[in-house]
């Protein structure tokens, strides 16, 4: 018989922030941690445009994806300090655009560090891009990783959030909530019914020791 937990799914929009290319990936993940790709793409902006117009293009693309695919949560990768401070600055602006898009849609927003995403998808927080892309394709049952890398990265971010459930900034515009890696909830009453059911299913899955999808054979 089919596992009833497979009927309980969460749809996550993962965003890999970038001003020239912003990866956007939507995945459905059930309570047994099986993941499937719903959409993947890259929002682009021309270097010939002024900065605020470039950001507007990225914002419009995120709004369109949210409107078309109706994710239940948005997850984005944390921007960390790098040598190129200008690049960090523009990427943080895109991150702000994504936060605003989630806020306009009334969606919870989660932030995950690059090492957290790598660890969730590959089991190694120091994995390189090729390893991440390979595991994204394997987890989602794809023949090959999506291109460019920004697209695959957005899917990895979505998978990371669906599997870990941490990093949430808020379930609603008037509240904050966190879901620990063990599935324990804080501010339970402020979660939506679907989010509460998902967290409980994830916690039960961890207790019963469900097979890690990264180790499943196709």
Question: Positions of the model-derived regions?
Answer:
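Phosphate- and other anionic-substrate recognition elements at nucleic-acid/protein interfaces
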Residues: 1-218
